[in-house]
Structures are given as structure tokens and as C-alpha cells.
A protein has these predicted regions:
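Short, flexible helix-loop junctions that flank or precede catalytic/ligand sites
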Residues: 2-340
Length: 340
């Protein structure tokens, strides 16, 4: 029987990032946009069950027996972990796994803009959103920010996560507590008061993918806590448009967002016609003029504010694309029409 470790070793030979195992098929890995078969042998449902059974705990096994999905993290070597999503298809088990470094990157490793780093790290309350599409490095950036806060100040950080990924180093003057949704955290109604009573300075809510997490983020940021979360979106404009529709999108809600939102950072990976990959970004930091735009739901006014470049920590993708064109990374024709 193939083990998860053997599958990971095979996928690393192809420089794969994603592993996909479906009962009755040959396992495959994905590297960039290419898919590679890992051998020729199909894995039957019993074999797939044995693989996932080898790394699940009893609680996770019960969820699978009840027909629920499971997300967990598995150590697959000294330097890597795999975030595994176990689900059912056609009545049998399947799973997808993403290979991630066990050691967290720093903001410097990620080339996080220094001008934005200064703006974010001087904040001690409010809401910061790290945005992007799937696989854009949102969680990696979030953890790098937490690491930076822990190094620069004496703070108590609580990180709420779907699964524990990576290992934070020890800090001389800071503490990071990590709690898992659905295991350590089950009741959102009591969670807010529990966190407030815990002498909390910084809270990571992980991915804001439901209204409970958004409500928690807004409530705690309004009570003097610095809250950081990740969110899906095509760009800053899209993130703000979707955010302001939540909870009915009324004036009272927009006023709350305008008051607590510190900024949105969005990053994406692009590829030119020669196959070369680049990471580009855009940033919005919420200043007094833009708070008014949020209250009035004037998103286009915020986009214009970013385009004008009146603030060094605010810029849009049109400037990032133009910088790539100027440096020879892209041709003008490769730039999406929206950003020309």
C-alpha cells in the first residue's frame, strides 16, 4: 500500500504543490498549470481509506463516518507539512493536499512592501484584511504579519485556524496561542467574551468565509483589538463591494466598517507568455476621506483614491502592471484591459 509520505515524495520529484487522490483513479499532482500522474496504479477505495486513516485522529474519523468533510494538517517531512481536505465523491473517500513549508516566511521573505508594513505595524486596533484568490499566499502573508507583531512588541496574539499550519518561533516578549475552529472553538456566542477576558492584543480570525467570523472580527476590532483576517476577492475593489453587501449592507453596518477597517492588501501571481511568473499587489489604507466613501458606499471613489497615488501606502494594480511593463516583465498587450 502506498503511504502519504510516498505520494509526497513522488510529487516532489515533479515539483508539485497539490496532490489529488480519488478512489479508483491514479493519484496526480499539480505543478503550476501542469498535472502529472504519479505512477500507473489506481488506488481503490480501501487503499484510500487506509491512507487517510493513518493520519486522522478519532474525532476526525467520526466526522468522516458521519459523512462530513475534514480539513487537517499532516507533517510530511522535516521542512514540510500538507494541508489535507478529505471529502466524499460517488460514495467513496477522496482527498486533496497542498504542500506548505513548515517554517513561516517573514515579511522580508515575501517582499511585503515596506511602506505598507510601516502603516500596518503601527496599528494597535482595527481590522486588516489580507486578500487574494485561492493559492495566492493569503495565509502565508497573515502569519508573516503575526510574526512581525510578535517581534516588534510585547503582545498576546490568538490565532483561530481551520487547521494548525507551520510553527511559530519562540518570542522573547510575546505569546501566540493557536486554537482550531470546530475543536477548540465551537460556540461563537461565547467566543467573543472569552477572548476579551483573555488579555488579548491581536486576533487572527483566519479566513473570513462566513458571517460568524466577520461579525467576530468587526465586534472585537471595535472593542480595541487589532484583528487580522484573510478574505477571497479578485481585487481590493471586489473585496470592498462584497464586504459592504453583508448583513444587508445598511448604513449602520457601513458606518461600523468605515470606523474599524485599517486596510486591505491584495496580492496575485501572474504569468507572461514566456511562462515567467511574477507576484504583484495593490493596497488600500483607510484614511479619513475614504471612511466617508465607505459610509456612502462609493467604492469607485476609493478606487480613484488608490489610482491617484496621493498616499505612499495606497496603490492599485494598474501601477503594479505598469511597473512590470517598464521592467520588461510584460508587454502592454499582456496587461488586462481593466488595468491599462
Amino acid at each position: 500500500m502506498q503511504s502519504l509520505q510516498e505520494l509526497v515524495s513522488n510529487m516532489r520529484e515533479h515539483k508539485g504543490q497539490w496532490l489529488h487522490v480519488v478512489s479508483g483513479t491514479v493519484p496526480v499532482c499539480k505543478s503550476g498549470s501542469k498535472i502529472h500522474r504519479l505512477g500507473e496504479l489506481r488506488l481503490m477505495s480501501a487503499q484510500v481509506y487506509q491512507i487517510v486513516d493513518s493520519f486522522m485522529n478519532q474525532g476526525q474519523k467520526k466526522k468522516i463516518l458521519l459523512g462530513e468533510e475534514v480539513v487537517t494538517t499532516v507533517n510530511v517531512g522535516e521542512n514540510f507539512q500538507m494541508r489535507v481536505h478529505i471529502y466524499r465523491q460517488r460514495g467513496t473517500l477522496a482527498f486533496s493536499g497542498k504542500l506548505i513549508p513548515a517554517k513561516f516566511a517573514t515579511l522580508m521573505d515575501l517582499n511585503f512592501p515596506e511602506k505598507l508594513q510601516r502603516s500596518f505595524l503601527k496599528s494597535n486596533r482595527g481590522l486588516i484584511l489580507i486578500a487574494g484568490s485561492r493559492d495566492s499566499g493569503r495565509t502565508r502573508t497573515l502569519n508573516a504579519l503575526l510574526d512581525a507583531y510578535a517581534k516588534q512588541s510585547s503582545v498576546h496574539i490568538v490565532s483561530l485556524e481551520d487547521s494548525i499550519e507551520g510553527i511559530f518561533p519562540r518570542y522573547d516578549n510575546s505569546l501566540i496561542s493557536r486554537r482550531i475552529y470546530g475543536f477548540d472553538v465551537k460556540d461563537f456566542e461565547s467566543l467573543e467574551e472569552s477572548l476579551i477576558k483573555g488579555d488579548l492584543n491581536v486576533l487572527s480570525v483566519g479566513e473570513i468565509n462566513n458571517l460568524d467570523r466577520l461579525r467576530l472580527a468587526l465586534n472585537l476590532s471595535s472593542r480595541g483589538i487589532l484583528v487580522i483576517g484573510t478574505i477571497l476577492g479578485v481585487d481590493v475593489e471586489g473585496v470592498l463591494m462584497n464586504l459592504l453587501k453583508c448583513f444587508g449592507g445598511g448604513l449602520q453596518f457601513r458606518m461600523s466598517v468605515a470606523e474599524v477597517l485599517k486596510g486591505v492588501y491584495h496580492r496575485r501571481t501572474i504569468q507572461n507568455l514566456d511562462g515567467e511568473r511574477y507576484e504583484i499587489d495593490e493596497s488600500f489604507v483607510n484614511y479619513a476621506p475614504t471612511r466617508k466613501h465607505i459610509r456612502e458606499n462609493h467604492i469607485q471613489s476609493i478606487v480613484s483614491f488608490m489610482k491617484t497615488g496621493g498616499r505612499s501606502d495606497c496603490w492599485d494594480y494598474s501601477r503594479s502592471y505598469q511597473s512590470l511593463v517598464d521592467n520588461g516583465g510584460l508587454t502592454v498587450d499582456e496587461v488586462p484591459q481593466k488595468y491599462r
